From Swiss-Prot:
Binding positions for (2S)-2-hydroxy-3-oxobutyl phosphate per the UniProt entry: 84-85, 126
Subunit structure: Forms an icosahedral capsid composed of 60 subunits, arranged as a dodecamer of pentamers.
Record-level Gene Ontology MF annotations: 6,7-dimethyl-8-ribityllumazine synthase activity
Protein's name in the database: 6,7-dimethyl-8-ribityllumazine synthase
Catalytic activity: (2S)-2-hydroxy-3-oxobutyl phosphate + 5-amino-6-(D-ribitylamino)uracil = 6,7-dimethyl-8-(1-D-ribityl)lumazine + phosphate + 2 H2O + H(+)
Pathway noted in the entry: Cofactor biosynthesis; riboflavin biosynthesis; riboflavin from 2-hydroxy-3-oxobutyl phosphate and 5-amino-6-(D-ribitylamino)uracil: step 1/2
Organism: Staphylococcus aureus (strain MRSA252)
Residues where 5-amino-6-(D-ribitylamino)uracil binds: 21, 55-57, 79-81, 112
Length: 154
């Protein structure tokens, strides 16, 4: 038997957890995610957005929303850009671990759409220019994973 997630968003309920920090990037990621969800037939009324101060706060809010039973998928969006200190490494590691842990604890797909870049230029490239829009890519993954899990439960 093969299990496969279809890219049809009809009847899915999705929440996006997005960081306000580096909002000139995360705003573009959010636009890309919402546009992609709608293009794949997710009803706009079935897309909720939760804003958090920074990337570090994403896992806690993602867990609360995933545990609510109200959503088929959670998309996490943020942008951490390397600076002159080791803060970047700590934040990136903990956020990645936190999002992964939410997947394990809730059985709701929590998609990692958090940019971890070496420069502002790299972030801009991944927010809708040269390297596509990682928010849009996260939305496609959310639809596929939500439908895949539904097919396994059936």
């Amino acid at each position: 038997m093969n299990f496969e997630g279809k890219l049809i968003g009809k009847e899915l309920k999705v929440v996006i957890v997005v960081s306000r920090f580096n909002d000139f990037i995360t705003g573009r990621l959010l636009e890309g995610a919402k546009d992609t969800l709608i293009r794949h037939d997710v009803n706009e009324d079935n897309i909720d957005v939760a804003f958090v101060p920074g990337a570090f706060e994403i896992p806690l809010v993602a867990k609360k929303l995933a545990s609510s039973g109200n959503y088929d998928a959670v998309i996490t969006l943020g942008c951490v850009i390397r600076g002159a200190t080791s803060h970047f490494d700590y934040v990136c590691n903990e956020v990645a671990k936190g999002v992964s842990k939410v997947n394990d604890q809730t059985n709701v797909p929590v998609i990692f759409g958090i940019l971890t870049t070496e420069s502002i230029e790299q972030a801009v490239e991944r927010a809708g220019t040269k390297a596509g829009n990682k928010g849009a890519e996260a939305a496609v993954s959310a639809i596929e994973m939500a439908n895949l899990l539904k097919s396994i439960k059936a």
